[in-house]
């Protein structure tokens, strides 16, 4: 089960990815986490990435693909994985497909989360997470059962991302529609795209996602 979750920031991809991980036991692969791990461990590609970052430059698609490739080769990905926040562009999508093909692998499905812009801005403007386990909360939509205590791990420490505000969100959406939304047509043309209503309640979205996964 090799998945890509596609949709604008705030569409609920992270929440649904967590649920897929818990139910199906496949890892959620974030390029940021993979990059930090590769640099920390000091793999060959990690050293290349560190040299680029130390020079204050952006890590190239080539290096990111190499890091994703390296991560997919690890044993916990044998039964599948979820790509989180990647690919972001058509160039990255082509490179990802070529990388998987070289391993004799293929994507199982790409799930698109559809949410209108006004709702996305509202969601992100009130979002915060548990600093310990990363569980996502919202000022009005999802607060901890016990005030100030994470439902999942019991931590009392929470954090808000500096860019989780309306002004920044509007800019992020502009980038998404320019660079990432073309992937919807790309994967539709390949017969890989399935869409869910990201405006629905979280549990209903999960039901839709599981319905898609059950047909794989």
From Swiss-Prot:
Write the Enzyme Commission number(s) for this entry.
2.7.4.3
Q: Which GO terms describe its molecular function?
A: adenylate kinase activity; ATP binding; zinc ion binding
What InterPro entries does this protein map onto?
A: Adenyl_kin_sub (IPR006259), Adenylat/UMP-CMP_kin (IPR000850), Adenylat_kinase_CS (IPR033690), Adenylate_kinase_lid-dom (IPR007862), P-loop_NTPase (IPR027417)
This entry carries the following GO cellular component terms, namely: cytoplasm
* Pathway membership: Purine metabolism; AMP biosynthesis via salvage pathway; AMP from ADP: step 1/1
Q: Which domain of life is it from?
A: Bacteria
Give the subcellular location. Cytoplasm
Bilayer-crossing regions = none
Q: Where does ATP bind?
A: 10-15, 127, 136-137, 200
Q: Where is this region: LID?
A: 126-163
Catalysed reactions, as listed in the record: AMP + ATP = 2 ADP
GO BP annotations listed: AMP salvage
The ranges of region (NMP) come to 30-59
Residues binding AMP: 31, 36, 57-59, 85-88, 92, 160, 172
Q: Which UniProt keywords apply?
A: ATP-binding, Cytoplasm, Kinase, Metal-binding, Nucleotide biosynthesis, Nucleotide-binding, Transferase, Zinc
Residues binding Zn(2+), per UniProt:
130, 133, 150, 153
The record's comment about this protein's domains reads: Consists of three domains, a large central CORE domain and two small peripheral domains, NMPbind and LID, which undergo movements during catalysis. The LID domain closes over the site of phosphoryl transfer upon ATP binding. Assembling and dissambling the active center during each catalytic cycle provides an effective means to prevent ATP hydrolysis. Some bacteria have evolved a zinc-coordinating structure that stabilizes the LID domain.
According to the record's subunit comment, the protein's assembly and interactions are: Monomer.
HAMAP family linked: Adenylate_kinase_Adk
What family does the entry list?
Answer: Belongs to the adenylate kinase family.
What is known about what this protein does?
Catalyzes the reversible transfer of the terminal phosphate group between ATP and AMP. Plays an important role in cellular energy homeostasis and in adenine nucleotide metabolism.
State the protein's name.
Adenylate kinase
Q: Which organism is it from?
A: Rhizobium etli (strain CIAT 652)
């Amino acid at each position: 089960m090799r998945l890509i979750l596609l949709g604008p920031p705030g569409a609920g991809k992270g929440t649904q990815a967590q649920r897929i991980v818990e139910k199906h036991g496949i890892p959620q692969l974030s390029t940021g986490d993979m990059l930090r791990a590769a640099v920390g461990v000091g793999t060959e590609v990690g050293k290349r990435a560190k040299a680029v970052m130390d020079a204050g430059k952006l890590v190239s698609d080539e290096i990111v693909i190499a890091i994703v490739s390296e991560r997919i080769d690890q044993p916990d990905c044998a039964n599948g994985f979820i790509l989180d926040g990647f690919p972001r562009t058509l160039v990255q999508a082509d490179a990802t497909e070529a990388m998987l093909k070289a391993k004799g692998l293929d994507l199982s499905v790409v799930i698109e989360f559809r949410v209108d812009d006004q709702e996305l801005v509202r969601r992100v403007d009130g979002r915060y997470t548990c600093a310990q386990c990363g569980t996502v909360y919202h000022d009005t939509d999802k607060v901890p059962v016990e005030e100030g205590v994470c439902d999942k791990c019991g931590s009392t420490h929470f954090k808000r991302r500096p860019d989780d505000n309306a002004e920044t969100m509007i800019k992020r959406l502009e980038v998404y529609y320019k660079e990432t939304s073309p992937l919807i047509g790309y994967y539709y043309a390949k017969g890989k795209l399935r869409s869910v209503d990201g405006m629905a309640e979280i549990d209903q979205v999960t039901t839709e996602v599981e319905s898609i996964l059950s047909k794989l």
